[in-house]
């Protein structure tokens, strides 16, 4: 009996499944942990209803609710999402960007930044503008603020090696691409937070240009902690300071092809607000 060959479509599905599985198995530690926290937080939003605990109201970034006792919201709102659709879209958008960042800068640096200035600075910018300029109180949640922050950093790095792209006879600066995506996202998803995305993007530009890199922990301190705790030996998928693939925040630009890698994912971020 003649051997049967797998149809081309079936082979493509198998190949894509294998590539996806291989990619997921190579995700670094902090990226895995962040995705897991997002998923578990979504589960909590469902389970919490039976406990009379509204996770969204508890952890969303609500400008008028920010005070000394509720500063935790600055760190919780990126992990909380409006619904399963919102959760999946932000995971798909955020994972490749975060994975790239962690491989470039290390796990410990990623933890320090995403639980530090990458959350607090755009969050406080949003709260300040909402409360004192717009006199509004629109709650926001979701990881899309981080998506645009990382896209801003990628855009600046791309600009250093490829300053323009051409449409017809016009030269468009490459750094403007995420800004256009913020506008497009706001137009296609009216419930998304234009201000939240813009705050994240501005912080990403600041880090990409090097103005905010002083907020990153010094490498000598990271090496001291890694050595004392033997993090590389104890934690699987950990990326040490000496394993990172690039320099610190734009000091060593990547190639044009790699710098463009994060951009295609931006259109699916869809950060959303609580309520209408």
UniProtKB/Swiss-Prot annotation:
InterPro entries for this protein: Peptidase_S54_rhomboid_dom, Rhomboid-like_sf
| Annotated compartments | Golgi apparatus membrane; Golgi apparatus, cis-Golgi network membrane
Gene Ontology terms describing biological process? proteolysis
What function is annotated for this protein?
Probable rhomboid-type serine protease that catalyzes intramembrane proteolysis.
Annotated EC: 3.4.21.105
Highest rank taxon of the organism: Eukaryota
UniProt similarity note: Belongs to the peptidase S54 family.
Residues forming coiled coils: none
Catalytic activity, as annotated: Cleaves type-1 transmembrane domains using a catalytic dyad composed of serine and histidine that are contributed by different transmembrane domains
Q: Care to name a GO molecular-function term for this sequence?
A: serine-type endopeptidase activity
Gene3D superfamilies found in the cross-reference section: Rhomboid-like (1.20.1540.10)
This chain's protein is named Rhomboid-type serine protease 2
Where does the chain cross the membrane? 27-47, 77-97, 109-129, 132-152, 175-195, 198-218
How does it sit in the bilayer? Multi-pass membrane protein
Active-site residues from the entry: 144, 197
Q: Does the keyword Cytoplasm apply?
A: no
Q: Which UniProt keywords apply?
A: Golgi apparatus, Hydrolase, Membrane, Protease, Serine protease, Transmembrane, Transmembrane helix
Q: Name one GO cellular component term.
A: Golgi membrane
